[in-house]
């Protein structure tokens, strides 16, 4: 079996919340509102939304930002929620006692939530560097364009 190895990302951090006692459908309703937004904007949205699922997601986003600042030294103003996903967890089954010795089953659904934050300051520096290289007066001998030359000349792409 071939395993997909994750590449080590230097610009992203994540926080994972497992077995949160909430329906995955209800958590997705909140997660869809904050996906793709900045860290500060997401916190503001989560504080003002009137759903019960906002508080555990708020804690996860806050934890991911703490991981970013403590482990990798990122600034919180540059963080963006790049990926937020909700997966269904186990269903906890209980029995509720009823009258005359009977019992009714109760199902508590759980979910797993993953929040990934990315630091966009690296991308801005990268774009500034490319803009510098594209200037007409800039001559950089270390620039390697072999992949573009191979693609434009045909090379491997002409053969089938």
Swiss-Prot record:
PROSITE patterns per the UniProt record, alphabetical: RIBOSOMAL_L22 (PS00464)
Record's GO cellular component terms: chloroplast; large ribosomal subunit
SS bonds (residue pairs): none
SUPFAM superfamilies listed in its UniProt record: Ribosomal protein L22
PANTHER family (alphabetical): CHLOROPLAST 50S RIBOSOMAL PROTEIN L22-RELATED, LARGE RIBOSOMAL SUBUNIT PROTEIN UL22M
Assembly behavior: Part of the 50S ribosomal subunit.
Protein's UniProt name: Large ribosomal subunit protein uL22c
UniProt organism field: Barbarea verna (Land cress)
Lineage: Eukaryota, Viridiplantae, Streptophyta, Embryophyta, Tracheophyta
